Amino acid sequence: LDPQTLRVLLRIAGALLAVLGHVYPVFAGFRGGKGVATGAGAIILIAPGAALFSALGFVLVLGLTGIVSAGSITAALILPVAVALGAAGRPVSAWLLGFAIFLALFVVYTHRANLGRIARGEEKAFEKLRFLRGRRK
């Protein structure tokens, strides 16, 4: 492996282990978070340009709906597209694209209960976060 590929692989491996450790922590009975914040932090370090596009998607959906999980899922789904289009700021790495796809699918998987609540109209919306459209009275 060339040094650049090795650097990317090591970053991805660290990010993958951090996300999995957050979602399935050994000392908390393998019940943790949903991996969004940890994954976002990792992507900021690995592919800051792609992270920016994902963050914009998060803010847009959060501002429209007030639903954090919808923003998180949107950001995750934007990530592989942003990486594929070169927003990572470097030539598209198959390893990075693969990790972005995995992370997107994993975030959707960890939010499956939230998706059910969204579909039923039961997911909690934070009205104060709905800054892009009028507040409900």
Question: Where are the predicted features?
Answer:
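Interhelical loop and helix-boundary elements at the membrane-water interface
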Residues: 1, 23-37, 63-74, 110-137
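Hydrophobic/aromatic positions within or immediately flanking transmembrane alpha-helices
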Residues: 11-15, 69-72
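Short, hydrophobic/aliphatic alpha-helical segments
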Residues: 13-27
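Alpha-helical transmembrane segments of multi-pass membrane proteins
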Residues: 18-22, 58-62, 83, 100-110
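Loop-to-transmembrane alpha-helix initiation sites
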Residues: 52-54, 68-76, 91-103
